């Protein structure tokens, strides 16, 4: 780094305090840190040293993640972290990654940002925390940095780096952020202020990992963040007469589109093929201090329709693959070149995908209520969702079943950063499992239907029994009306004693008094009638009526017999007289 310091003296000599400049020079000072995207990507010093765009993009995300972690451990505000990140972006626009250790420069930028934003942290604390993060794979790092020799070496490295950063930036430490214009604009909208502000704030924080701050002014970035947040939340931003909302930011539609597209590109870049191996192992995301486990899922009608979707996954520990730091690196460059990889990546979900999954979930719960107890909401954090080829991907966390169309499609799943396609054999197994689950669900529905049918049959039987009871009462009423008239059918009851009745087979059955016998009634009806038997008064009345009927029949029979004997006697006497 001493060579870098010597080579940058021209920047130090040209640095002049800002109070001696006039307003025109101040305007030039602000505008000199904004460049075209082509210039940033094609003409950077790193490109001249053989580092391609993809590698530089990865390195940019890496030091952003490192600064986010460092700032959170030092407990500095998010604005201070953002200032440190912008210092780094500006430094590496003029310096090459091949000649400077990005984490040493990032540590210097955090130390400077604390002083610029009036939230300073002692140099000793900055060095201790930085050393522990960089050497996190070394369990004895926290003890090594307490050694005087190691600490003095790191202190000298940071102080020399501070001179290099100041000279490279031309001692221009004025930085403006999108946070203030964003909050002021949302206050005017008066539409879902809390949710809109939080999501837009997250977009601004994620945008720090890109080169947007070198291309667009802060209020342009704020407009792009609000635009994406409104699309994500499906909120219609108000217009003041003929003036639309984005005109508040003095931004053109072209600029708004560019900012939005570059923010969305960041999420697409999180999917990096494993074939890049040692060069770029994975995409390292810069987490947000203001984003406590929130899950960003962004979609816009204009820009996101054709975007590739990816699940939220955690980044992996990085190995020592980056060797572009030069021979002059200090102890900070010995272990774990990619130490900032603890933060989680937040990727974009397509709006149509989210709506489809929600619809499938609701349909499944309506048709299978038994599964409702097992449903869990998707966690709002960045836990890794890694699926293997042999895993049943048709069964989701809430017990949801994908439709046949979704199961038949070949899907890419994340295993680390590699993209693995499922084989036809695995898909066949998935189809069989889905089919078995559906058959099981149908059986459950069938059992519920049968139970309902049984209940309906019970109701019908009960109604029939009520009708039988009414019929019995009608028969009793008719019987009372014809008590005085003789009936030929009553001859079957002759010869019975004490209410004993002969059935069809000639067997004697003891029946309850006052109970009517019906050979066609089933045993269930008999039991029903016993439960619903006549009260004692009716039973005694029936007994008296039965006895009287038997007496009348006996009397009529005896009287008929006596009359018949008299007639025979008279006829016999007359025949004797004639003879």
Swiss-Prot record:
Where does the source fall among the domains of life?
Answer: Eukaryota
Keyword terms, alphabetized: Cell cycle, Cell division, Cyclin, Phosphoprotein
- Look up the coiled coil feature and give its residue ranges: none
InterPro entries xrefs? Cyclin-like_dom, Cyclin-like_sf, Cyclin/Ssn8, Cyclin_N
Biased composition, class Basic and acidic residues, residue ranges: 349-380, 389-414, 474-512, 538-556, 563-579
Q: Matching SMART domains, A to Z?
A: CYCLIN
ATP-binding as a keyword?
no
The record's GO molecular-function terms, alphabetically, read:
cyclin-dependent protein serine/threonine kinase regulator activity
According to the record, the residues making up region (Disordered) are 1-27, 271-419, 474-579
Q: Which Pfam families match?
A: Cyclin_N (PF00134), CycT2-like_C (PF21797)
Ranges of compositional bias, category Polar residues: 11-20, 306-334
User: Mind listing the GO biological process terms from this record?
Assistant: cell division; regulation of transcription by RNA polymerase II
Query: Which spans does this entry mark as compositional bias, Low complexity?
Result: 274-283
Q: Which residues carry this modification: Phosphoserine?
A: 423
Would you identify the family this protein belongs to, as annotated? Belongs to the cyclin family. Cyclin T subfamily.
The protein here is known as Cyclin-T1-5
Q: Which species expresses this protein natively?
A: Arabidopsis thaliana
What gene name is given for the protein in this entry? CYCT1-5
């Amino acid at each position: 780094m001493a060579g870098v310091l010597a080579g940058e003296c021209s920047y130090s000599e040209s640095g002049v305090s800002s109070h001696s400049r006039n307003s025109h020079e101040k305007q030039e000072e602000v505008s000199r840190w904004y460049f075209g995207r082509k210039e940033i990507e094609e003409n950077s010093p790193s490109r001249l040293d053989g580092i391609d765009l993809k590698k530089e993009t990865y390195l940019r995300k890496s030091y952003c993640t490192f600064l986010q972690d460092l700032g959170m451990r030092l407990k500095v505000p998010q604005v201070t972290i953002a200032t440190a990140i912008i210092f780094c972006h500006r430094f590496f626009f003029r310096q090459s990654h091949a000649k400077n250790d990005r984490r040493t420069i990032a540590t210097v930028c955090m130390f400077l940002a604390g002083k610029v934003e009036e939230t300073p942290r002692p140099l000793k604390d900055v060095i201790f925390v930085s050393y522990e993060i960089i050497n996190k794979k070394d369990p004895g790092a926290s003890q090594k940095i307490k050694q005087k020799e190691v600490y003095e070496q790191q202190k000298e490295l940071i102080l020399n780096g501070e001179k290099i950063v100041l000279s490279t930036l031309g001692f221009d430490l004025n930085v403006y952020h999108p946070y203030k214009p964003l909050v002021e604009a949302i206050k005017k909208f008066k539409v879902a202020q809390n949710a809109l502000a939080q999501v837009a704030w997250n977009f601004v924080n994620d945008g720090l990992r890109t080169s947007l701050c070198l291309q667009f002014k802060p209020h342009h970035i704020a407009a792009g963040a609000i635009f994406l947040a409104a699309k994500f939340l499906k909120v219609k931003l108000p217009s003041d007469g003929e003036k639309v909302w984005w005109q508040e930011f003095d931004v053109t539609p072209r600029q708004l589109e560019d900012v939005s597209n570059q923010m969305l590109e960041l999420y697409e870049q999180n999917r990096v093929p494993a074939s890049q191996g040692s060069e770029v192992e994975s995409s390292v995301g810069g987490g947000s201090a203001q984003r406590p486990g929130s899950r960003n899922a962004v979609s816009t009608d204009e820009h996101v329709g054709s975007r590739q979707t990816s699940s939220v996954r955690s980044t992996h520990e990085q190995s020592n693959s980056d060797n572009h730091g030069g021979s002059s690196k200090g102890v900070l460059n010995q272990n774990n070149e990619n130490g900032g990889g603890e933060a989680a990546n937040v990727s974009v979900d397509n709006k149509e995908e989210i709506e489809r999954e929600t619809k499938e979930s609701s349909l499944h719960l309506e048709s299978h209520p038994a599964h409702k107890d097992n449903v869990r909401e998707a966690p709002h954090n960045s836990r890794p969702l890694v699926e293997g080829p042999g895993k049943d991907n048709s069964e989701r966390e809430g017990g949801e079943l994908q439709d046949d169309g979704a199961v038949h499609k070949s899907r890419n799943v994340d295993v680390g950063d590699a993209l693995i396609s499922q084989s036809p054999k695995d898909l066949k197994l998935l189809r069989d499992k889905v089919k078995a689950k559906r058959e099981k669900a149908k059986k459950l529905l069938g059992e519920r239907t049968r139970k309902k049918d049984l209940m309906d049959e019970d109701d019908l039987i009960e109604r029939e029994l009520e009708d039988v009871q009414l019929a019995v009462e009608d028969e009793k009423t008719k019987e009372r009306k014809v008590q005085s008239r003789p009936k030929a059918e009553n001859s079957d009851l002759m010869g019975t004693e004490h209410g004993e009745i002969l059935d069809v087979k000639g067997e004697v059955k003891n029946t309850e008094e006052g109970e009517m016998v019906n050979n066609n009634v089933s045993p269930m009806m008999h039991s029903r009638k016993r439960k619903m038997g006549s009260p004692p008064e009716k039973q005694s009345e029936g007994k008296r009526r039965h006895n009287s009927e038997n007496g009348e029949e006996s009397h009529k029979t005896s009287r008929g017999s006596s009359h018949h004997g008299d007639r025979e006697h008279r006829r016999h006497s007359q025949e004797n007289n004639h003879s």
